[in-house]
Amino acid sequence: MAENMVWDPLRRKNVPLTPEERVRQWFITVLKDRMQVPLHMMMSEVGMKFGEGALKKEFRADIVVYDRRPGPMMIVECKRPDVELTKEVLEQALRYDMVLDVKYLPLTNGNRTIFCERLEDGNISFLK
C-alpha cells in the first residue's frame, strides 16, 4: 500500500490519506472498538441528494451508523484537525439529518468530539 493511502474497512478499498480521512478512520475505530459497533452496521461516504431540478445538490455523509431497525441511527461528521467544530459544522450534519432522520449526530475533528442528540421535539441536546 502506498504511504499516502489507507485501507477503509467500510468501503473495502484503499483511499487517499487526507487529514479528514485520518479522522474518519480514527472514528471508525472508536465506533468499532469502544462503542462495539460492528463494521457491517457502518457505511462511509454515504451519498444523498437535496432539492429538485436545478436546485438539486449532492452531498456525502462521512459515516452513517445503522441499528437493528430499518434505517440509520447516527451520522458522524468528520473534519480535519485544524477545523473548528462550529455551528456551521452542526448545520451541515443537520442537513444530512433532514434526509436520513437519525437520533445522534457526533461531530469530530480528531481533537474534539461533540455528541449531539436530536430530541423528539426537534431540538438538539449536547451530550457529555
Give each language-model segment a name.
Residues 1-104, 110-128:
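A short, conserved, highly charged catalytic patch centered on acidic carboxylates
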